[in-house]
Design a protein with these regions (language model features):
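Conserved active-site loop/cleft motifs that coordinate metal ions or position small ligands
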Residues: 43-44, 80-86
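Aromatic-rich peripheral "rim/lid" segments of glycoside hydrolase catalytic domains that contact
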Residues: 15, 85-130
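Extracellular glycoside hydrolase catalytic/binding regions
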Residues: 1-76
Length: 130
């Protein structure tokens, strides 16, 4: 989440097809800005709505945040994808993830994520099924 100099991006532009970033602060705003600055497609390579500063032992991957972020990124014509960070098995060492130690899904959050993905899928099918 450290700033990157525009000079670095400008130097790389002739050699790249897509800009790919991690962003745990404001990915919707930042990816929109990078797309507008460069004209390049952007990919949210790693992000999550985890409350990192929470005192809770387990920190769920926030399904509502995911759904809101996915919908907002979908409105960015330059955004080509979103990779969720922390979609691992939750255990006592790695205290976040979409599956618990017995591989049971965090249904509350997974269901919200699934519904968001299905909404985008329906839009894609309608838009491109000609």
């Amino acid at each position: 989440n450290a700033p990157i100099a525009m000079e670095v991006i400008d130097a790389a532009k002739p050699y790249i097809d897509v800009l790919s970033f991690q962003d745990f602060r404001d990915p919707v705003k930042h990816l929109d800005a990078w797309h507008r600055k460069t004209g390049k497609p952007v990919l949210l390579a790693d992000s999550a709505g985890i409350r990192w500063r929470s005192k809770a032992f387990y920190k769920p991957n926030n399904g509502a945040w995911y759904a809101e972020t996915l919908e907002a990124l979908h409105k960015n014509p330059g955004c080509i994808g979103f990779h969720l960070c922390g979609a691992y098995q939750r255990n006592k060492a790695r205290r976040r993830g979409l599956l618990d130690e017995q591989e049971n899904p965090d249904s509350e959050h997974v269901d919200l994520m699934k519904a968001a993905n299905e909404k985008i899928t329906r839009w894609m099918e309608k838009e491109f099924s000609h």
